[in-house]
């Protein structure tokens, strides 16, 4: 029975969502705090999208 408790605790830890991985960035303040820029429509060349800036079509872009 103790093995089941251990198994359930490991499953709980591994299946828990990680902060920052699934949530992403959703507002301009968080985007700027992460050293990124808000850009309309698409990210400029050599930038990677890491979230949105809250407005439809506005991307949060950061250099890799």
UniProtKB/Swiss-Prot annotation:
SS bonds (residue pairs): 31-60, 38-53, 43-61
Signal sequence bounds: 1-23
Region feature Phosphatidylinositol 4,5-bisphosphate (PIP2) binding, mapped onto this chain: 33-48
Main localization of the protein described in the UniProt heading: secreted
SMART domains: DEFSN (SM00048)
Molecular function via GO: CCR6 chemokine receptor binding; chemoattractant activity; phosphatidylinositol-4,5-bisphosphate binding
Gene Ontology cellular component terms for the protein in this record: extracellular space
Coiled coil spans: none
Domain of life (superkingdom): Eukaryota
Keyword GTP-binding among record annotations: no
PANTHER family: BETA-DEFENSIN (PTHR20515), DEFENSIN BETA 4A (PTHR20515:SF2)
Subunit-level organization: Monomer. Homodimer.
Assigned protein family: Belongs to the beta-defensin family. LAP/TAP subfamily.
Record function comment: Exhibits antimicrobial activity against Gram-negative bacteria and Gram-positive bacteria, with highest activity against Gram-negative bacteria. Antimicrobial activity against P.aruginosa seems to be salt-sensitive and is reduced with high salt concentrations greater than 25 mM. Also exhibits antimicrobial activity against the yeast C.albicans. Permeabilizes C.albicans cell membranes via targeting plasma membrane lipid phosphatidylinositol 4,5-bisphosphate (PIP2), thereby leading to cell fragmentation and cell death. Acts as a ligand for C-C chemokine receptor CCR6.
Name this protein carries in UniProt: Defensin beta 4A
Species of the source: Macaca mulatta (Rhesus macaque)
UniProt lineage: Eukaryota, Metazoa, Chordata, Craniata, Vertebrata
Name of the encoding gene: DEFB4A
